[in-house]
């Protein structure tokens, strides 16, 4: 439960219809197994103590008494268990039979949640035996003790106040207004569903989308435990289709037609953070659902949940291709609007033969195609200087030619040398002044050419560079429209690769592939033996790490210690712990002290959930202190 993670389980035990003693043993065995796997919340199917398919046997007092006794036995079995258990059971209250989920913890029945919506159509006829639960929760006397009874009961962990669990039962989630909606609005961060949903053709897909969608709508974790093998097959088959979702993502899913327990970790801090950020997720003004406190030890667990190395890049190849096409279109549409609005005659792109300027040129060409404008009006400017290599220079020229742009070369070495003379800088001093003078000279050239041609300077810098401040202030940092400003470096590479893969021009494809093979570099220092001497990732760290840090820091507001924990797990065998911590420290420090560059960014289109525009997604003061974040890093022990 440290850093918000809690291990949860959805269990489908082997049962026998109406064989309550057998079912009780199976449930207790599953509880034991779940505890051995460090699960803190365990959810069982609907009416699993007796079996869902007992039919009119539910009218038999002997079965109902056996179920009540079984509930007491299972409750006692949890006494030494540090977990919250939800189990489905039929229960008679005031001569009426209710379909109930019992919440159990450390030998106590915390509450009895009733089923609200009883299906009575098709293969279902629950109203024949059961009564729908009351409209509002209350209390009943059970085994000599008062116990909360009714819909939407909230169970809150005393050791982690953000962990609030509520239950609903099968059909409840299929209804127009599921009880979980009210529960979430009153604070529930995890919904459990004890279900008995039979298998018919295509129903698994609908069920999966339903649970995924409900977790997204509620911004919650959702644990769905379904009945499986052992239920009667007189008319139906149950597949044990268990699902665990979090805010629109399926984290764990059982293989159907095999009784099993599935596990994953829910991130409660992430859920709470998303709700806090989402201003349309409003909490109920009037609280009507009771909160029942339960104890749970705080401990660190080994994470089994996987996190993507490249969170900005879809892992599935087909989805990645679709996403790349969509992103390129968004970028081009943004630029198209700006070109038309300003009545610009030309688009001026500084090209270096690197990834970012390549993507900017591709996007500009696409925008011109959308407008129906001659791509000769794209002015691709190459500005070789002290650090330019033959490889990048050739690639820049070939690319401009194959895309149909007008190539212009402006050598800036003499201008920069004269500038050094003017300001009294020694050209042998390869300090930041040496580097930034070149970047600013290039920007001046581009701006002046744009003025001379009634054009617009297209920015090439990407979001990863902006996060790190890896840009020269008022140099490559500045443009008239930044098409790459919301594209992280790891995604830039895939966008260029996608463009290479789909082009029908073999010469363009060849040059794009060579750009992909070229080390990332600003080329501001002289080359060594004709090769790039200044490699960005040697200086500021691997971009795949920085993009990982950027995503989890901005998307979910994770603290550095939590990001470090996820990175160590995700990049195990790729980077040492020391390396991960070193570059995470660099990221946090630079992210704060380079905000002044982001505070005056040019306009540019947003393309994803993480963006750094000071006018939109990220409004941060330039003089904020990083001390709290750095102290969190200092707590990490290697």
Feature locations, PLM:
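ATP/NTP-dependent adenylation/nucleotidyl-transfer catalytic domains that generate, transfer
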Residues: 7, 161-163, 220, 229-232, ...
